[in-house]
């Protein structure tokens, strides 16, 4: 869980997103940072027994800096007004499928899968789907997964209009093969993060994503 003071810090930062305010509130930030790290540690403690691939992860592998990269952005606000928790065997610097928790006043959610893979990884995932699409269908149709997440998140930006090169339009998995991103998500109210059962509640949902993550990671870690 996060304290209400931590949520208030994020709200105040959003309203005062500048370096002077941040420096004036540095002590508040340090308290917030410890709270954030504790939350990540709690997720690791809850998830590691359920997914052995996470065993070597430490808190520092799963957090994000509060500073924004504004080099190529029109929005020059220097700080993020949200936090994320990323749990993956590939850590943050490697392309793998994983579990994600996003906490923001603008919209909080949990998610899993592989977001916008690079070209070579995308080819590997599509190849895996082409050969083992029945396995993927079984994962997505599992009753608890279907109840909590339903399907991949789909929008016009992450779906090709035509079949990808090398695949026929009548391939039985063509709707999966046309995807450019393979993630699924569920929204939650940000106030839930202040409740004592937040981590345990979210862990029960996140672990439902393990078969999907395993399927994708099997593809991206293959040699061919």
Tell me what each language-model feature is.
Residues 26, 30-69:
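Gly/Pro-rich turn-and-neighbor structural signature
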Residues 71-130:
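Aromatic- and glycine-enriched beta-alpha-beta binding-site module
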Residues 105-162:
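Compact, glycine/acidic-enriched structural inserts
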